[in-house]
């Protein structure tokens, strides 16, 4: 009803303005043609008789019930005509009834209404102006700084050191040309606490033995199957990115080669390895980068109540050392600061790490976002924290969330204050002030919001009011708990969802809701104010046209009249358009100079009912009276609403009909200025990154596999090949034999081992040389050459035995047999036979030579037999020398030159 009233009021104002405008335009455009007595008009008698033509117009005049020709419309409205042309009106235009039928055919839904005068039985009044609503807004909008925390899914990481000994026992069968492993036993043994502290950390050495328990039996493994010694730790061959390592040996010990026997060899490799360790909430165990689990809390110890932490091992397997100075096994440098060192022995290894207290080393929450501008608004029973920077809205309760309920949440307050102070100093220090202390709220999805309210410096006087409001939101019991109560207070771990989409959707909904509510609020306010303004116009317009105002108000056609400050209304009766006939003249024949201001009509309530005379009112109203009279004026032009169109009367006579489309429409609507929803781009926002999700697990399988596959490369020499030596057993036996004889035996052993080694090397060299084809050929040639030399030596010995002089002096004997010197032959002839003295001397010399040879043989045999034989030989030598000195004289040398010439 209010909407209809508003439309009616606007139409009334517009039509009033339009009527005044058209009147002015018509008056200014109409030509002045006074003295037009022959105006052609068809009038109808008061009893409703047929219309008759006016006299001075020649020809028959159209009657009132003449039907207009169908589909005959003027192309353009005819211009105003002077009064003298009234005779041509009937001939130049179609009859009124034909035009009316055209209008009725085009607008079959146009109805007419007969409105009886109201009697006052029903009266109405207008509603008083209403109080317009205010725009819906959130309560207590507050700006501030926020730090959003999420669940910390990252594990607690720390450095640990592993001490263990790799024990390898290999069984080898040696053949003549090959070796075969019959079995390899590998095990890992822990390093005792004393060895870790007194040997490895103090001196950088490790024992060559491994003592450990397997199957409840204590066993000991000896490196190289030898006595216990200290072995130097050396850096590993290949270090990883996150750890270092040291070990004592690169090569596996294999037993000495003894063909056709099974031999065993033991290798003990002491390994010290720095590894990364991880532990996740509730920190009851941790795992090493090698994949080994330790079922003890990394915070277990004997200090500050840490003995209450979880452990699955016996007490004698754990040791805590205060004032421990770690040593770098590569540089041998000692740490400058002492630490508290935890040591734990497991069946496979010993692990050590620096002990730290649980608080504040770990925290179950971590900082996610720092928001410079966070708007907090109150909707119903919740707070909504919205930020355009991250396109997110968080919903929380109105009460703060106490940090004491967060298990291991010591880092929250410190990190939040540091971030807020940094943001405030950078951005708000000169324009805003802080309101109270940071507040903490638990949002949906497991996000903890640390919020610092801010106030502009211009609103500083409102600080007290805001502070009081904040105090009302504090928990019911803000007093600090008594000592010891925190231990009994229930704590919880906040679980944060891995998706932020719900907060993004909440932000989108709030963004749209805020825009729509603001828009609808403005529309509601404008509508209410417009209604109040129009109500004043309606109150004034009802005095001018109560029928139109009443019809627009009640939403249907009624008749009304003012009864003081109220209106009396009556319901109008609809009349079909086919039962209404308009007459073609508006002049009153009985009263010259008087004319009707509205066209006259005849109508029937029903199709076969009696004809009723009346007058056409406004908006297709059929008035039962004909009292709308005005003085006739010159240049009269009027447009009257008739059915679905208009009828045009000129000089109080019908001219032609027009449709509504032929009249220019002036809009009375007020444009509604609605701001379109602005574009908003969502930025990618992740609660947990891929790296955080990947790193959240307790065990990094990639790191474990990488370390396991690098173990042999780091702590073993995979390139060196040891060939089995058959003489190794002999050398090992000789070495062990001489080692048991003390220092002198070791000295002698070195000499003997050197000689034996040389012999073995020579034999090995010969064997290697013989195995070469070229060497075998060379040896064959040498053998043939040796046989040839032996043959010639044998021949020489045989000749020496048969004829020594000929063998010793072949040339001399040859010259004696065949003399070539003539002088010698002559002298021989003169001299005759050989000199007997010289022959005797020669015989004597030969005899003494034989004697000397016999004496030397006797002395040599006496040396072999003993001391008595040696004395006998000496006495014999003295006798022979004495005898030789008395009987032997030197042969004169005076004939030497002659003898030489003779020879």
From Swiss-Prot:
According to its UniProt entry, one GO biological process term is: virion attachment to host cell
**What does the entry list under GO cellular component?**
host cell endosome membrane; host cell Golgi membrane; host cell plasma membrane; membrane; viral envelope; virion membrane
Q: What subcellular compartments does it reside in?
A: Virion membrane; Host cell membrane; Host endosome membrane; Host Golgi apparatus membrane
Q: Ranges of Pro residues compositional bias?
A: 52-61, 475-484
Q: What is this protein called?
A: Envelope glycoprotein B
Post-translationally, this protein is described as follows, namely: The cytoplasmic tail is phosphorylated by the viral kinase US3. Phosphorylation may be linked to a down-regulation of gB expression on cell surface. ubiquitinated.
Q: Which residues lie on this side of the membrane: Intravirion?
A: 795-903
Q: What is the residue range of the motif Golgi targeting?
A: 848-851
The set of disulfide-linked cysteines is 115-572, 132-528, 206-270, 363-411, 595-632
Annotated membrane topology is: Single-pass type I membrane protein
Enumerate the residue ranges of region (Hydrophobic membrane proximal region): 718-771
Q: Which residues are glycosylated?
A: 86, 140, 397, 429, 488, 673
Q: Could you tell me which species this protein originates from? A: Human herpesvirus 1 (strain F) (HHV-1)
Question: What range does the record give for the signal peptide?
Answer: 1-29
Question: According to the UniProt entry, which residue ranges have a biased composition of type Low complexity?
Answer: 30-51
């Amino acid at each position: 009803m209010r909407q209809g009233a508003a439309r009616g009021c606007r139409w009334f104002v517009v039509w009033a303005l339009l009527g005044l405008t058209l009147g002015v335009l018509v008056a200014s455009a109409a030509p002045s043609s006074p003295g037009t007595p022959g105006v052609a008009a068809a009038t109808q008698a008061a009893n409703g008789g047929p219309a008759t033509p006016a006299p001075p117009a020649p020809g028959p005049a159209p009657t009132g019930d003449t039907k207009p020709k169908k589909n005959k419309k003027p192309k353009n409205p005819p211009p105003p005509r002077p009064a003298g042309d009234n005779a041509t009106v009937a001939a130049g235009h179609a009859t009124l009834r034909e035009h009316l039928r055209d209008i009725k055919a085009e607008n079959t839904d146009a109805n007419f209404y007969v409105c009886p005068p109201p009697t006052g039985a029903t009266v109405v009044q207008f509603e008083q102006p209403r109080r317009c609503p205010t725009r819906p807004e959130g309560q207590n909008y507050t700006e501030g700084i926020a730090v959003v925390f999420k669940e910390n899914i990252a594990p607690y990481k720390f450095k640990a050191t592993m001490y263990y000994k790799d024990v390898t026992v290999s069984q080898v069968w040696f053949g003549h040309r090959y070796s075969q492993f019959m079995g390899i036993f590998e095990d890992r043994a822990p390093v005792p606490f004393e060895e870790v502290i007194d040997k490895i950390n103090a001196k950088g050495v490790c024992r060559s033995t491994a003592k450990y328990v397997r199957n409840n039996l204590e066993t000991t493994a000896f490196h190289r199957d030898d006595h216990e010694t200290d072995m130097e730790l050396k850096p590993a061959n290949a270090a990883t990115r996150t750890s270092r390592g040291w070990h004592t040996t690169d090569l596996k010990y294999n037993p000495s080669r003894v063909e056709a026997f099974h031999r065993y060899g033991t290798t003990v490799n002491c390994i010290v390895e720095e590894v990364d360790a991880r532990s996740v909430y509730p920190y009851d165990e941790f795992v090493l980068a090698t994949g080994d689990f330790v079922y003890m809390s990394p915070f277990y110890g004997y200090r500050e109540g840490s003995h209450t932490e979880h452990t699955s091992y016996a007490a004698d397997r754990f040791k805590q050392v205060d004032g421990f100075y770690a040593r770098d096994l590569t540089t041998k440098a000692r740490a400058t600061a002492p630490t508290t060192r935890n040591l734990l022995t497991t069946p496979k290894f010993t692990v050590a790490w620096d002990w730290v207290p649980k608080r504040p080393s770990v925290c179950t929450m971590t900082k996610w976002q720092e928001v410079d501008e966070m708007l907090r608004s109150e909707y119903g029973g919740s707070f909504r924290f919205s930020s355009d920077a991250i396109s997110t809205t968080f919903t929380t309760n109105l009460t703060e969330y106490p940090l004491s309920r967060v298990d291991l949440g010591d880092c929250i307050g410190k990190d939040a204050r540091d971030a807020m102070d940094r943001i405030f100093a950078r951005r708000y220090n000169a324009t805003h002030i802080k309101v109270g202390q940071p507040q903490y709220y638990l949002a949906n999805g497991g996000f903890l919001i640390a919020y610092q309210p801010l106030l502009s410096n211009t609103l500083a006087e409102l600080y007290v009011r805001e502070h009081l409001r904040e105090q009302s939101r504090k928990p019911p019991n803000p007093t600090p708990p008594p000592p010891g109560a925190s231990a009994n207070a229930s704590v919880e771990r906040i679980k944060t969802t891995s998706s932020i989409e719900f907060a993004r959707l909440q932000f989108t909904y709030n963004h749209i809701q805020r825009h729509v509510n603001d828009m609808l609020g403005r529309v509601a306010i404008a509508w209410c104010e417009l209604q109040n303004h129009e109500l004043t116009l309606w109150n004034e317009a009802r005095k001018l046209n109560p029928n139109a105002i009443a019809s627009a108000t009640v939403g249907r056609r009624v008749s009304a009249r003012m009864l003081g400050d109220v209106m009396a209304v009556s319901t109008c009766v609809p009349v079909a358009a086919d039962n209404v006939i308009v007459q073609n003249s508006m002049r009153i024949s009985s009263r010259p100079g008087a004319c009707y201001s509205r066209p006259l009509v005849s109508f029937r309530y029903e199709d076969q009912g009696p004809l009723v005379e009346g007058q056409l009112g406004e908006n297709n109203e059929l008035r039962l009276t004909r009292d709308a009279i005005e003085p006739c004026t010159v240049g009269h032009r009027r447009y009257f609403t008739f059915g679905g169109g208009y009828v045009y009367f000129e000089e109080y006579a019908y001219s032609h009909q027009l449709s509504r489309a032929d009249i220019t429409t002036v809009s009375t609507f007020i444009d509604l200025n609605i701001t379109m929803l602005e574009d908003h781009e969502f930025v990618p926002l992740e609660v947990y990154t891929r790296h955080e999700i990947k790193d959240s697990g307790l065990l990094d399988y990639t790191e474990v596999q990488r370390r396991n596959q690098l173990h042999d490369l780091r702590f073993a020499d995979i390139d060196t090949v040891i060939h089995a030596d058959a003489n190794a057993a002999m050398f090992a036996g000789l070495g062990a034999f001489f080692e048991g004889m003390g220092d002198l035996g070791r000295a002698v052993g070195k000499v003997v081992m050197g000689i034996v080694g040389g012999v073995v090397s020579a034999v090995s060299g010969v064997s290697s040389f013989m195995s070469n084809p070229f060497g075998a050929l060379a040896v064959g040639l040498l053998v043939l050459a040796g046989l040839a030399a032996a043959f010639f030596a044998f021949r020489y010995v045989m000749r020496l035995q048969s004829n020594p002089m000929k063998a010793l002096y072949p040339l001399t004997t040859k010259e004696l047999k065949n003399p070539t010197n003539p002088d010698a032959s002559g002298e021989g002839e003169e001299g005759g036979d050989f000199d007997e003295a010289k022959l005797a001397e020669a015989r004597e010399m030969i005899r003494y030579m034989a004697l000397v040879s016999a004496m030397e043989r006797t002395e040599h045999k006496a040396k072999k037999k003993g001391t008595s034989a040696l004395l006998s030989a000496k006495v014999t030598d003295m006798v022979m020398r004495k005898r030789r000195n008395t009987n032997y004289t030197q042969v004169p040398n005076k004939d030497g030159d002659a003898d030489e010439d003779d020879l």
